[in-house]
Amino acid sequence: MSEFWHKLGCCVVEKPQPKKKRRRIDRTMIGEPMNFVHLTHIGSGEMGAGDGLAMTGAVQEQMRSKGNHRDRPWSNSRAL
């Protein structure tokens, strides 16, 4: 009899939980940006391979010169 339970135990395994199907997002589900404030522009040539770290400080300084954006109330960038 114990041999029966031994064989039965070998066949019973815990089944993995089925993965939840992720909802696929398409373009119609994505709206326009909210609270977007354009602070600066970085061109493709400005962040070259050799000067990336040095340029980062310059970009941060340029953003600081635009004013303290954290103190400004955020608003929608679209005109109503």
From Swiss-Prot:
Disulfide bonds: none annotated. It is found in: Cytoplasm, Cytoskeleton; Cell membrane. GO terms for molecular function: small GTPase binding. InterPro entries: CRIB_dom, CRIB_dom_sf, SPEC. Residues 48-80 are annotated as: Disordered. A lipid is attached at residues 10-11 (S-palmitoyl cysteine). It is a lipid-anchor. Residues 30-43 form the CRIB domain. Keywords: Cell membrane, Cell shape, Cytoplasm, Cytoskeleton, Lipoprotein, Membrane, Palmitate, Phagocytosis. GO terms for cellular component: cell cortex; cell junction; cytoskeleton; plasma membrane. One of its GO terms (biological process) is negative regulation of JNK cascade. Gene3D superfamilies: CRIB domain. Probably involved in the organization of the actin cytoskeleton by acting downstream of CDC42, inducing actin filament assembly. Alters CDC42-induced cell shape changes. In activated T-cells, may play a role in CDC42-mediated F-actin accumulation at the immunological synapse. May play a role in early contractile events in phagocytosis in macrophages. The CRIB domain mediates interaction with CDC42. Belongs to the CDC42SE/SPEC family. Interacts with CDC42 (in GTP-bound form). Interacts weakly with RAC1 and not at all with RHOA. This is CDC42 small effector protein 1. It comes from Mus musculus (Mouse). The lineage of its organism: Eukaryota, Metazoa, Chordata, Craniata, Vertebrata.
